[in-house]
């Protein structure tokens, strides 16, 4: 067979690769551009991986010959992680010597010259050593502690905190059903609750006197003692609620009871509310002859009043004083007299009969209902304190309240007579810190009643030691919803707390229950109590009628306030 070779065929050419010759060692003489600026580190596949935190590195105990039996692989630190301190938060410390006051200079000068033993600078019982150091023996240490009142307190400084008393004594036959702590209650929310619908309106209102808006510190006005009856009737004793309960609603209460529950997370003092469940209906009541209707003073302060009951600055006496100031102020700022115009609602005052000839406070009662969802209809009695006629002739309903100053030095507050005219915001901010719960209750009551304005009066003692005479230093007005936003009061959370308690009681059997705020813990407890509780021992309650207690403090003539 003959082979023919095609000389015209094209074959791929072979190009010799460039082989670099390194005369001084091994490896390439030049690096490609892709590998420039890359640090070199000997690497072996047997090396343990770890960059940020290498707990697997072996330790070498031979300190003298550390490179002995060592391998170059896995020892490089080109890719090691180093934690760098952030110096942006670094601050220099001022090490300059503090200049001592003149009375402290050289007070150890004589000790450096003293000798051990009895001398001019050494007293009996003192051990004076060299270098100016003086120590007491154990006997004198105990004597010194006794004089200072130290004693054995095991690290406690100052007197122990005073434990608050409960509003009602828990009895052995009460069964605890539920405990609700404040952190859980604060997270509750029930949004989109519409404005309440009026069912009935009762009472007569007097018009507000605008001259009180011009009062200031330099033009103060004495607080008068108004002899008028103020009714604080509980839910089941209200004849209108009894009538409405037959046709409308399944949860019944008053605005004061609702405000106490809705603002419970801001309260520190103990309080209690009695709840009766009859079928599918719930009635919320306050106990008779209790301090439920008294206004607290400095309840949320860092240092609340803790004086004994004999002092005029005790918590109870301050609450009585604040309650009377509030009642007198709300009636004094109105235009009184037979010749003055009055605003009359559809029905008369339900708590007085037609044949009674008594002077009743200016109060308008508005019975409203709210739809809370899940077939829960709330019916409550709300109150207005006065009315104001606008230039257009339309009435504006007012909720009139009073803040009182008792002793700014003891209350850690600000001097109203110095700051009220120039820095009213600072005065109000201080009151929001000291009386957060009370102001929140007033705001909730104004929102529930549908008041157009919330009038706040500033009333102070003429003399800090005299709790029976007061002067009006100024007034201020707010819109309830705007003021609620200003004091960080969420109505959605308030409705959520109320709905939570209603749902909890609805799940129980028919009977009587009690909600109580723990006096020393941020907890609300629900108890199942016997049906005859508080029925037979009201007269033996031990506290007596609050009206009698008021007269002992103020000694008002012909005072018949029903509280």
UniProtKB/Swiss-Prot annotation:
Give the record's keywords alphabetically. Answer: Cytoplasm, Initiation factor, Phosphoprotein, Protein biosynthesis, RNA-binding
Q: Where is this region: RNA gate?
A: 291-305
> What GO molecular function terms would the record report?
mRNA cap binding; translation initiation factor activity
Comp. bias regions, Basic residues: 100-121
* UniProt keyword annotation of Transmembrane present: no
Q: Can you say where in the cell this protein is located?
A: Cytoplasm
Keyword Ubl conjugation belongs to the record: no
Record remark: domains: The RNA gate region regulates mRNA cap recognition to prevent promiscuous mRNA-binding before assembly of eif3d into the full eukaryotic translation initiation factor 3 (eIF-3) complex.
Free-text function comment from the UniProt entry? mRNA cap-binding component of the eukaryotic translation initiation factor 3 (eIF-3) complex, which is involved in protein synthesis of a specialized repertoire of mRNAs and, together with other initiation factors, stimulates binding of mRNA and methionyl-tRNAi to the 40S ribosome. The eIF-3 complex specifically targets and initiates translation of a subset of mRNAs involved in cell proliferation. In the eIF-3 complex, eif3d specifically recognizes and binds the 7-methylguanosine cap of a subset of mRNAs.
How does the annotation summarize its subunit structure?
Component of the eukaryotic translation initiation factor 3 (eIF-3) complex. The eIF-3 complex interacts with pix.
What name does UniProt use for this protein? Eukaryotic translation initiation factor 3 subunit D-1
Q: Which gene encodes it?
A: eIF3d1
